[in-house]
Amino acid sequence: MRTLTTFLALPVAATLVMGLSSCSLFSSGTSTSTKDLEVGNCYNTVSKESGGDKPVGEVTVVDCAKTHTYEVVAQTTFGEDVKGLPNEDSIKSLGEGFCQGEDFTAYVGVEAGKSSYQIEYLSPSADTWAKGDRKISCVVSQGNKSEVKGSAKGSKK
């Protein structure tokens, strides 16, 4: 399981309804490990929740034109020089710093601080780290976990 962390809650914009500018390759919903998500994937509610940070294993990836809750907008990895699982502060620093950066702006079309999206990130857990998982996936939602249709790509929201 990976960990979903919410770190930036901004006011929620009107429901996002857009074209098909960045749809995933999945058309009817495919159960996918969160470590296998890619930028542009849209998906629905996480499979397991336990309070604050949520352990996440599998999600249902759907075409972004279909109703979904989350979208992956950017990804990065811990460098090869990082030997052991970083502490929570290191993960938070990388996740929050990266997910508010240039890749977010390039994908959404507006700086994170001006975006109406709630930004969260998926990070390795101790179990997935031991299996080679080094990826941080930045994801956006409407903040109240409401479902939307269309992609965040180029939305300027």
Annotate the PLM regions:
Residues 5-8, 23-157:
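Primary mode marks residue(s) on the alpha4-beta5-alpha5 output face of response regulator receiver
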Residues 18-22:
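C-terminal motif of bacterial Sec signal peptides marking the signal peptidase cleavage site
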Residues 1-13:
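N-terminal export and membrane-targeting signals
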